Amino acid sequence: MPISHDVRQYSEEYDRLKLGIPTSSNFHKIITPHGKRSRQWREYACLLIAERILQRKIEFYRSPAMERGVIVEAEAADWYEFDQDVTVQPIGFITDDAHTVECSPDRLVGDDGLLEIKAPLPHTQVDYWLSGAVNERFWPQLQGQLYVSQRRWVDLLCWHDVLPKIVMRVEPDAAFIKALDRELQSFNFLYRACHGKDPRYQRGAGPPRTIGIEGGVPSEPGDCPVTANPIIARRHSPDPLSGEDRAGHF
């Protein structure tokens, strides 16, 4: 069941509660728009593991379009509310009940919808306007928002203060969401295993085994490319979250 967290986006509390959790805005690092495993899968998993161990958010470059999106979000949401004759509501973020995945839509729309706002550069806005279609690079994020929130649709608003504005509705894609669910299950298993949350990977749970890794990520959910290494698996340090000794920290 989806759980809404009513905190201000980008606040200190927002970052703390989201720490180390796969987020829909980064689902493209887990799954491609075509439903295949992303080549960024392992790198993203290691990033989240590092965040959990360090207990701080790891900052990255934010493009001008991303910065602009934050600045114009309120104005764009007001325009959408008037243009579509709907009521929108701010939201911090939404997680599943196990707190293993999350999404941060820009607004809730009524009881069934979401709003995601993009503020692209002018030439990109024109490209979206001419194509009249959702750019595939947004597909994992939008489908991920529907997967986590269990809402019926999400409106993608590509907003510019002068150029034509575009609103495109996206509904759940059953085949893609099935593939997304599969990849998220594997991804979260790796996270728990390598962070010492799965009892099979705790110290004393048996000797490490040698496994084959396809493309640098586990071939199956039970294959952890960190703890399966006999040298790495023998190293351990206290878990900063529980105070217990766990295998797999290095």
Task: State where each predicted segment sits.
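Conserved catalytic or regulatory cores that recognize and/or transform ribose-phosphate-containing ligands
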Residues: 156-234, 249-250
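Generic structural marker for isolated residues within well-ordered, non-membrane alpha-helices
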Residues: 46, 77, 142
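Charged, glycine-rich intrinsically disordered N-terminal tails and low-complexity linkers that flank
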Residues: 1-71, 203-204, 209-240, 245-250
